[in-house]
Amino acid sequence: MKYVVLGASAAGISGARQLRALDKDADITLVSKDDKIYSRCILHHYMEGIRDVKKLEFVEDNFIEKNNINWIKGVSATGVDVNKKYVTLENGNSIEYDKLLIATGAHTFFPPIPHLKTAKNSIGFRNFDDCEKIMEMSKNCKNIVVMGAGLVGIDVISGLLHTDCNVSLVEMQDRMLSIQLDKKAASVYEEAYSTKGVKQYYEKGVKELIVDEDGNIKEILLTSGETIPCDLLICAAGVRANVEFLQNSEIECDKFGLVIDTQGKTNAKDVFGAGDVTGRNPIWPTAVKEGIIAANNMCGINSEMTDFFASKSTMNFLGIPTMSLGINTPPDETYQIEIESDDDGNYKKIIHKDGKIYGAILQGDLSYSGVLTQLIKRKIDVSK
C-alpha cells in the first residue's frame, strides 16, 4: 500500500505516525514545503531566544527513520490527479498513491490593501522562514507595526519585546484577542503590553500604506486619520487554507477550504483531509485528532471525528495565565453571567442558560478549568 501525506505539521505528522502504527509494511511518503518539523504555536519563543530550533520540534529525533518514512522536504504539491492517482510536485516530479492525506495547512491572509503583499518590508507570521526573516529585518528597524491582535499577532509582539524597536499594534475590533476574551480579561493584557511600551490602536483599520520610491512601506495611515511610522509591517490578520493546488482537480473545496466529512474523507475516492487546510477549527489538538481519524479510515478502521469542541484557548502572555472556553459574551439576554474577581488578578466569568454552561473565562487562577471544559463540552445540566 502506498500512502502519501501532504504536510508536515500537526495533522500530517499525526496522520503519518498513525499510518505506520497501523500498517508496518506500507510505503509512506511525506511531502512538505517545510524542511523542519516544528510547532508553529511556539515560534515566538524562538524569536525571544527562549527556545532554539531543536526545542521547536514536536517529534522524537529519529521520527522519520524510526517510522520508515520517505520525506520529500522543501517541496510543495502543485496538483492532484484523482483518476490516475498521483500528486505533482513543484520540482517537476510526481508521486503515485493508493491513499492520499491532504494536510497542507494554511497561509497568511493579506487584506486587499495596495502594497501590502508587494512591499519588501511587509511579511506574515506563519512559518519558520517568516520567523527568521522577521528576526533579521528587526535588527535594522526602528518602528515595527503588527496588524491584527489575535493570538498570532500577540505571539509576534511577545517575540519582539526584547528588541529595541518601537512596536505598535493595530486592530479593527475594540480589544485584543476579541475571539477568545471579553473586555475585562483583554484589558489586563492590554495594560501589561502597554507597560512594555507597545502602542495599541483599537477600532481602527489600515486605510493606506505610504511607500517610498522603492516600494517600501514608510508610514501607515489609519482609518482614524492617525499615522504610524513603519519600517516593518507584520500581517497577522488571519489565514487562508492552502488549497490553491487543488483548483484543477475534482476535489471539493468551499470558501473555507478542503471539504471533509467526519471520517476525514473528501468527495474523491481514497483522498482524505485533516487540519487547517479545511479552514475549520484551526487549533492544534483538533488537527492532531483529525490526522489520526483520517489515518484510521485510510487503513480501513472505521473512525469518526465526534469531538468538535474547538473553542478552547489557553495562553500565558507576560506571565498572565488565561483560559477561554466556549463563548466569551452572551448571544442575547436569555443567558446569565456569573463573575468573580479579586485584587490578586484572578478573574472568573461563567456564561450559562437553563442550567447549562456555554462559556467561561479564567484568568490568573485556572483551577477547575478541566471540570468547566467537560461541563461545556458535554453540555451537562448543572442545575440537576
What is the role of each PLM region?
Residues M1-I69, G159-Q180:
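Beta1-alpha1 glycine-rich phosphate/pyrophosphate-binding loop at the start
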Residues M1-K2, A8, V277-G370:
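Mid-to-C-terminal Rossmann-like scaffold of FAD/NAD(P)H-dependent oxidoreductases
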Residues L6, I95-G105, I228-G238, G291, ...:
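Short hydrophobic core segments
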Residues G7-A11, R126, M147-V152:
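Glycine-rich Rossmann-fold phosphate-binding loop(s) that bind the pyrophosphate
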Residues D25-D27, W71-L89, I95, T163-F256, ...:
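A Rossmann-like FAD-binding core segment of flavoenzymes
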Residues I42-W71, K183-V206, P321-M323:
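N-terminal glycine-rich dinucleotide-binding loop that anchors FAD/FMN and/or NAD(P) in oxidoreductases
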Residues T118-C141, D212, N216-L221, E226-N296:
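FAD-site-proximal beta/loop scaffold in flavoenzymes
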Residues K133-L181, I217:
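Rossmann-like NAD(P)H-binding beta-loop-alpha module
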